[in-house]
């Protein structure tokens, strides 16, 4: 759907939806929709950047979701993914991370993206400052292995 059509959406019916999943990476989104999407699940391609129109659509979806609807977000396990999560959580306070745990870092570290000492030091400082509390276990594992995990790593499992 072209983003210009968002301005014309006035109502969203989510009565049959029990889970909303936002996925940052297009390839992972496509694969997830084809192989894992559940009947009562709405899967939304996030795309990494929240334009004003995309923010408007996400806010509408969030307002229409039932209180019991599980809403989750999946992105790279790195600073960019943590930032995207925080921005989306500003719109959806009940948002939870999906496949962004320390366990996932351990599972996929052999395919991880090696990071510089500067990157790792900055990430450690962010963790110590409490910047990404939901990702403390993931950050600890990133620091241990010295790598971050791109979503594409999950396609090779």
Where are the predicted features?
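Structural alpha-beta junctions
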Residues: 91-97
């Amino acid at each position: 759907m072209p983003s210009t059509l968002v301005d014309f959406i006035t109502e969203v019916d989510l009565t049959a939806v029990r889970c909303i999943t936002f996925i940052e990476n297009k390839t992972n989104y496509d694969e997830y929709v084809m192989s894992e999407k559940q009947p009562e699940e709405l899967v939304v391609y996030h795309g990494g950047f929240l334009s004003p129109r995309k923010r408007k659509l996400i806010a509408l979806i969030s307002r229409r979701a039932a209180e019991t609807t599980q809403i989750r977000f999946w992105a790279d396990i790195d600073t960019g993914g943590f930032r995207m999560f925080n921005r989306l959580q500003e719109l959806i306070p009940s948002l939870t991370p999906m496949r962004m745990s320390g366990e996932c870092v351990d599972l996929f570290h052999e395919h991880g993206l090696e990071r510089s000492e500067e990157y790792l030091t900055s990430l450690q400082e962010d963790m110590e400052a409490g910047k990404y509390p939901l990702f403390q276990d993931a950050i600890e594992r990133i620091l241990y292995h010295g790598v971050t995990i791109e979503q594409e790593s999950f396609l090779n499992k």
